[in-house]
């Protein structure tokens, strides 16, 4: 009788993030970790979150089984390498929502998600093409994987759209012979598009689009990932009961590929971008 008279506290959803390593050691993972913490603040009365680090293709099956047994309702696998083995677990546990952050093809049992960073890169390219003082712009990338090529192409198209004479010089920062200063000096490059995300342990100002001035980086624009916004929108659909409905009938597999219009991707300009350029 007391159970009917005393209001029951709704069960909180348990949301778990799986990372290949500790988020503070990776700029990419740290951006997702900020998103996880944003969820904690936004839905403190409706869900609880946690993360597990050190998850790869070799142990993801066991990790998934363990956290599902511990009560996980929604699981975000932040690593494309987790996709194949995660699928096996997802088929056996359709009651749990498992998503993979990648451009991998989605499956009826696992949805994938990513962001349209190329939209912000195109705009950053327009800025670079408008302000370059010698028709040269540098683009420093890390790995030629997933959306990276699309980002590079979008940036180059942005440059060309306002300055057809300008050239984009590309360097891969993870190659053995990479020498940042040598690359920039030998090619007389003053404007640089560099890494988009920094880690808590890295106070470098060499990120986003910047101008090299007296050996220092003068930051101009910064493409950003708003993973908190993405996770918030997705969790709202779960809480509203519309998540399952999205995958019914004609649509059997879903990919969430959101960009600037959804608020997942953005471009922040500093005061050093000329007013006329901002109006482009």
Identify the meaning behind each predicted range:
Residues 2-280:
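A residue-level marker of the well-folded mature domains of exported/periplasmic proteins
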């Amino acid at each position: 009788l007391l159970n009917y008279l005393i209001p029951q506290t709704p069960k909180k959803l348990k949301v778990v993030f799986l990372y290949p390593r500790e988020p503070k050691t990776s700029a990419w993972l740290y951006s997702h970790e900020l998103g996880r913490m944003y969820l904690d603040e936004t839905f403190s009365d409706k869900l609880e979150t946690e993360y597990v680090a050190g998850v790869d293709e070799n142990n993801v099956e066991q990790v998934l089984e363990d956290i599902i047994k511990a009560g996980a309702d929604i699981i975000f696998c932040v690593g494309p390498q987790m996709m194949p083995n995660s699928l096996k677990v997802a088929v056996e546990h359709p009651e749990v929502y498992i998503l993979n952050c990648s451009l991998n093809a989605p499956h009826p049992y696992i949805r994938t998600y990513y962001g349209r960073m190329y939209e912000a890169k195109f705009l950053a390219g327009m800025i670079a093409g408008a302000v370059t003082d010698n028709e040269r712009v540098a683009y420093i990338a890390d790995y030629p994987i997933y959306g990276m090529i699309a980002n590079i192409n979008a940036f180059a198209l942005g440059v060309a759209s306002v300055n057809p004479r300008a050239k984009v010089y590309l360097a891969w920062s993870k190659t053995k012979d990479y020498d940042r200063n040598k690359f920039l000096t030998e090619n007389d490059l003053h404007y640089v598009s560099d890494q988009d995300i920094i880690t808590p342990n890295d106070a470098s100002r060499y990120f986003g689009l910047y101008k090299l001035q007296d050996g220092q980086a003068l930051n101009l624009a910064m493409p950003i990932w708003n993973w908190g916004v993405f996770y918030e929108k997705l969790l709202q659909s779960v809480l509203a009961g519309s998540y399952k409905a999205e995958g019914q009938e004609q649509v059997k597999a879903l990919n969430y590929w959101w960009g600037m219009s959804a608020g997942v991707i953005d471009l922040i300009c500093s005061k050093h971008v000329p007013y006329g350029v901002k109006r482009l």
